[in-house]
């Protein structure tokens, strides 16, 4: 089984763990722990799929000034690198955690990218010679501000023309326009549903209504609902309780496992397991197995 992952806004994800909660400013913390992993939503998806045994090709954009960590990571997991290199550096994001709380700093991707940049070149580079039939492409993450919001719609249409199954996980205008191209599967979270259906679903009836509205344009709909679980075409799967370390790759791991296995319970268990890992690192499969028993 071959999966292609398109990541236009990769990141180096750092997690800094403080020993206690900040008290309002001025503190100096010396006893801290820090982990760093390369990521970006589609990179997180690619990594989990590779761990599950899939053939994975990953592409999109990488800053040429600091691509070496990504090259090492992709090689480590046997993921084929078809990223386009652009001038500058790939962004670095931070998750700062302490007992009982956290905050996240997300920086913009490729702020120096020209508005004339040929964004479809990234999709075409990922596809290569397009000789693979029956593949699945996961288009995931935000877009650099220089790129048009309609890019994902163009990408979905392009990959569909190759006969590939298309999966879209984005937000805002990029997701709204991408939905118009009729992807096979989408995965918004509850808050990301608002610009798509006009409300944030909170009750069972509202999740059912949101799913029904979204399935007018998408083949299948997964709506993640944070620590409570996720809705798969209107069916709720509750998440097991875990000690949360970092939620960076939880939704990405859930989506990747669902694309791999098609099993909602496995997907929720994988997403929950990802919350126990720092900096977006993939969870051990034995942890997923254990959590699956509680789903």
Where are these regions (language model features)?
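Conserved N-terminal subdomain of the carbohydrate kinase-like
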Residues: 50-135, 290-295
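Glycine-rich phosphate/adenosyl-contacting loop at the front of the ribokinase-like
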Residues: 1-59
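Short beta-strand scaffold segments in enzyme catalytic cores
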Residues: 47, 92-96, 229-233
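Conserved phosphate/ATP/ADP-binding segment of small-molecule kinases
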Residues: 149-234
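Short pre-catalytic strand/loop immediately N-terminal to key active-site residues, enriched for Gly-Thr
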Residues: 29-37, 237-249
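Conserved post-catalytic alpha-helical subdomain immediately downstream of the catalytic base
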Residues: 216-227, 240-295
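Hydrophobic anchor at the start of a short beta-strand
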Residues: 3, 54-56, 81, 166, ...
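Short beta-strands and strand-loop turn motifs
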Residues: 104-106, 134-142, 169, 187-190
